[in-house]
Amino acid sequence: MILKLRIQLLLELLIMINQVYQLVSPRQFEATFKTIDLHNHNSKVIVRPLYLSICAADLRYYCGNRDSKILSKKLPMSLIHESVGEIVYDSEHRLKNGTKVVMIPNTPSKSHNIIAENYLTSSHFKSSGYDGFMQDYIVMKPDRVVTLPQEIDLSVASYTELVTVSVHAIDRFKAKAIPQFESLGIWGDGNLGYITAVLLKKLYPTTKIIVFGKTLYKLSRFSFVDEIIQIDNIPQHIKIDHAFECVGGKGSQQAIEQIINIINPEGSIALLGVSELPIQVNTRMVLEKGLTIIGSSRSGLKDFEKTIELYRKYPEVLNQLALLKGKEFEINTIEDLITAFEYDISNAWGKTVLKWNI
């Protein structure tokens, strides 16, 4: 109640003091203060974050596992681009205070009638050179938030952004792949592989879904797919029509090599995994088989809207996504933030969630 009165008083003064929690160097957070000016006439909403989720990209920054030139250019910076919150101000009075929303980290400054917003070089992305959601309040354009279903578990919804990445990749795959869907292979037994498997099993119910992974205890979580296979023991008879690579890192080279070897002619390979270093690809076999390689990165408004519609249409998808939730941390201090990030470094599977009380 006191917090709401404080917010209302600040809004009446048409200025807000916002505390932003930035990574200033590897493993070191500091709080800084910035003002939010409500005098200007630009349409905006202000969101109070409620739950956030740590992503692999956040960990790379936190641990300093990026090129030193990139770190010096982008830091200090607030981390995290996966978050849900509640509206505390809407300049157009379209959304009521307290409305629960998911926030879209991609911020386009221009539009294009062909190229998607997440591929425009003019777009900005939160927690990648621009402050992320580790703030007291987030100022956004009205089209950068999507209203959530009323009964949704906000802690599970916190990693909706990662779900939209998979939704976006599947849409691109649909638009470019030949219409042969007897079998689909997914490489990767981590968070993104799990989400992609959940979605493909729902969107292609009659297609055989096979997940290829390295670790048996992770693969055991994919009990809803048709078959799981360890990458060190792939049967010679296995063939797939199309593939989704969700491995990333050094392992993406082996994954792509295996895909090329067992995929049927004219199949499509959707690449979702991120590798910091260049990898080798057997282009001879890509040409010989007539394969299509589809790159996907991030997501935009349409992908968020489609994902929320999937939540409403298939509530069982949310139940499966809930199994991805790992440990939840209550964040009241910067020390709590450090504890959560340190935990996530050694977290082998699942999404670490932050309840944002700070």
Each language-model region and where it sits:
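N-terminal amphipathic/basic-hydrophobic helices that include classical n-h-c signal peptides
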Residues: 1-15
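Mid-domain Rossmann-like dinucleotide-binding core that forms the NAD(H)/NADP(H) cofactor-binding site
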Residues: 5, 152-232
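C-terminal hydrophobic helical "lid"/dimerization subdomain
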Residues: 15-18, 301-358
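Glycine-rich beta-strand-centered segment in the early N-terminal region that forms part
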Residues: 37-52, 67-110, 149-151
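Residue-level marker of beta-strand positions
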Residues: 82-84, 99-100, 137, 189, ...
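Receiver (REC) domain switch-region micro-motif
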Residues: 101, 184, 243
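NAD(P)H dinucleotide-binding glycine-rich loop of Rossmann-like/cofactor-binding domains
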Residues: 107-183
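Glycine-rich cofactor phosphate-binding loops and adjacent beta1-alpha1 units
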Residues: 176-180, 203-204, 219-291
